[in-house]
């Protein structure tokens, strides 16, 4: 079986191995495609069934561990959203113009979760599918990199953090320095603002 990175669950090598063992699968190869050719935080691997498997096996984590994990995750997500809202409000208060970068699911859903996403000037996407499109929930216009020539901002918050090196390289062509490009993960952590 070929498995690839899926956005609903963010597996790493360790968690993928543990998860598949519960269903009598063994990892054959994590290096099917060399890391330098994989994009961002993608995880691609191959696994095979063990001999004499019981495919009806449904053992999951004990309920108390599962519910605590999800309760803590929910708490951390809300805390992170509050930190993003503080960041957004603070920058507006001091007159900084901020744009988001990454109109994929992570960027769109995060902005839709914020009560003040309208403080962002727009949302940049390297290759938007068309012009005059807006992110659901936040209503932010999705623009291409060229938009920055006529509409510069002071800071860019990157939601697509797995592509950070590539994004910084692209933004440098438009005059942006590394200190103007922030990862939303860093902002979500406590103590940034």
Per-range role (PLM):
Residues 1-9, 13-15, 19:
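Short, glycine-/aromatic-enriched active-site segment of Class I SAM-dependent methyltransferases
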Residues 10, 27-29, 46, 99-100:
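Structured core elements
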Residues 21, 25, 51-52:
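Non-catalytic alpha-helical coupling and interface elements of nucleotide-dependent molecular machines
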Residues 25-36:
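Conserved S-adenosyl-L-methionine
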Residues 38-40:
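Short acidic/glycine-enriched loop/turn segments that link adjacent beta-strands
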Residues 44-193:
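Hydrophobic, well-ordered beta-alpha structural blocks that scaffold small-molecule cofactor pockets
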């Amino acid at each position: 079986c070929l498995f690839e990175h899926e956005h609903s669950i963010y597996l790493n090598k360790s968690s993928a191995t543990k998860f598949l063992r519960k269903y009598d699968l063994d990892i054959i190869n994590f290096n099917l495609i060399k890391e330098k050719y994989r994009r961002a935080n993608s995880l691609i691997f191959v696994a095979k069934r063990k001999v004499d498997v019981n495919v009806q096996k449904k053992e999951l984590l004990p309920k108390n561990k599962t519910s605590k994990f999800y309760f803590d995750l929910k708490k951390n997500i809300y805390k992170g959203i509050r930190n993003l809202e503080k960041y957004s409000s603070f920058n507006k208060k001091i007159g900084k113009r901020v744009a988001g970068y990454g109109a994929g699911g992570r960027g769109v859903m995060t902005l839709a979760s914020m009560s003040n996403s309208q403080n962002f000037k727009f949302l940049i996407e390297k290759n938007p599918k068309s012009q005059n499109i807006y992110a659901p929930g936040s209503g932010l216009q999705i623009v291409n990199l060229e938009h920055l020539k006529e509409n510069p901002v002071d800071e860019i918050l990157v939601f697509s953090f797995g592509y950070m090196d590539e994004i910084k390289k692209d933004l440098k062509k438009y005059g942006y320095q590394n200190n103007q490009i922030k990862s939303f993960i860093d902002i979500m952590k406590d103590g940034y603002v």
